[in-house]
């Protein structure tokens, strides 16, 4: 009897392997051979699921973004203020998973400058994230311009995250969280 393969599961495994290789070696250093080896598969298997490296990179970015987005639904039982804090905290590179996500996002942001599909993926992710934050902020008392506040918070988190990526010793998780809380407090968004 032929073996049944879950195509989406296999593609997800390959994308996770690609993310790990990109985190170690960068986009240019992430060869199809290295990604296949990281996943424990052959390049022939990889080619069966992705026509080329660009397709794999786009899928890898989308998968990373979808994992982050899926975490938002886990916060539906929290108050808007608590969900906002949890969402922003979970976006910071305070653990291996979010650090890899940020490395992939930043690495592929450079490629997105000349690749309209990658640019669209990045743009759509930010629009979705902004919309989610606006929804939370709109339901919080005292927030008069939710869209402006959402943009400010995205800038705050992105700034902290980039500093933490480039200077992990200087920006350990504790410092990232203090900076986040200071930014929220400045806007009177924490209790």
What are these model-predicted stretches?
Residues 44, 92-96, 140:
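Short amphipathic alpha-helical boundary/capping segments
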Residues 59-62, 70-101, 146-153:
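Hydrophobic alpha-helical connector segments
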Residues 1-9, 191:
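N-terminal intrinsically disordered/low-complexity leader segments
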Residues 89-96, 103-114, 183:
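Helix-loop "lid/cap" segments that line or gate small-molecule binding pockets
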Residues 13, 17-55, 59:
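Helix-turn-helix
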Residues 66, 73-75, 97-106, 116-141, ...:
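Amphipathic alpha-helical packing segments from all-alpha helical-bundle domains
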Residues 118-123, 127, 139-191:
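Hydrophobic/aromatic-rich alpha-helical bundle segments in the mid-to-C-terminal region
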């Amino acid at each position: 009897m032929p073996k049944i393969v879950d195509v989406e599961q296999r593609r997800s495994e390959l994308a996770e392997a690609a993310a790990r290789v990109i985190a170690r070696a960068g986009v240019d250093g992430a060869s199809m051979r290295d990604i296949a080896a990281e996943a424990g598969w052959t390049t022939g298997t990889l080619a069966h699921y992705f026509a080329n490296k660009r397709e794999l990179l786009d899928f890898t970015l989308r998968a990373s973004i979808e994992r982050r987005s899926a975490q938002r639904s886990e916060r539906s039982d929290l108050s808007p203020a608590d969900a906002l804090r949890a969402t922003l905290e979970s976006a910071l590179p305070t653990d291996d998973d979010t650090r890899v996500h940020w490395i992939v996002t930043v690495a592929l942001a450079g490629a997105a400058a000349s690749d309209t599909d990658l640019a669209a993926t990045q743009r759509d992710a930010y629009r979705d994230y902004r919309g989610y934050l606006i929804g939370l902020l709109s339901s919080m008392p005292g927030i008069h311009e939710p869209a402006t506040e959402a943009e400010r918070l995205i800038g705050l988190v992105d700034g902290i995250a980039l500093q933490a990526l480039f200077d992990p010793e200087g920006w350990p998780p504790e410092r990232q969280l203090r900076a986040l809380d200071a930014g929220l407090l400045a806007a009177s968004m924490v209790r």
